[in-house]
Amino acid sequence: MKNWLDEIKWDADGLVPAIAQDHKTGRVLMMAWMNREALELTAAENRAIYWSRSRGKLWRKGEESGHVQTLHEMRLDCDADVIILMVEQIGDIACHTGRQSCFYRVFENGDWKTVDPVLKDPHAIYSAGHKHE
């Protein structure tokens, strides 16, 4: 029997990009990487678990901030090389900058313009020395 994880086209580092979207509004919240273990645990625990390339370890979204992403649905694209996670974003903050989405800048008139407000000061969210989930 074929394992569902074998259907994914992992990159040379054994990773696949994962896009988290709000399951109610469809808004793109963030993009992160998943390895096989992260994807398997995400399915098993019904919460987003990513692979932190900078720290070289699993990253359970919300483990420090409390901003957990509860999984509602998982989709695989037509090329089997991108995952979409339809999630409920607990606390309404997905970005380490304290915003709802990591995609808070819009290209306008040749420049990037910040269009989404900071909902909570990142220093109040994360412990000292921890800059980014």
From Swiss-Prot:
One of the record's GO molecular function terms: phosphoribosyl-AMP cyclohydrolase activity
Biological process according to GO: L-histidine biosynthetic process
Reaction(s) this enzyme catalyzes, per UniProt: 1-(5-phospho-beta-D-ribosyl)-5'-AMP + H2O = 1-(5-phospho-beta-D-ribosyl)-5-[(5-phospho-beta-D-ribosylamino)methylideneamino]imidazole-4-carboxamide
Cofactor or coenzyme needed: Mg(2+); Zn(2+)
The protein's Enzyme Commission number: 3.5.4.19
InterPro entries: PRA-CH (IPR026660), PRib_AMP_CycHydrolase_dom (IPR002496), PRib_AMP_CycHydrolase_sf (IPR038019)
Pfam assignment, any one: PRA-CH
Pathway entry: Amino-acid biosynthesis; L-histidine biosynthesis; L-histidine from 5-phospho-alpha-D-ribose 1-diphosphate: step 3/9
Compartments in which it is found: Cytoplasm
Alphabetically ordered keywords of this record: Amino-acid biosynthesis, Cytoplasm, Histidine biosynthesis, Hydrolase, Magnesium, Metal-binding, Zinc
Binding-site residues, Mg(2+): D77, D79, D81
KW Amino-acid biosynthesis (keyword) present: yes
Annotated cofactor note: Binds 1 Mg(2+) ion per subunit. Binds 1 zinc ion per subunit.
Sites where the protein binds Zn(2+): C78, C95, C102
Top-rank taxon: Bacteria
Function: Catalyzes the hydrolysis of the adenine ring of phosphoribosyl-AMP.
Quaternary context: Homodimer.
Record family assignment: Belongs to the PRA-CH family.
Protein's name according to its UniProt entry: Phosphoribosyl-AMP cyclohydrolase
Annotated source species: Pseudomonas fluorescens (strain Pf0-1)
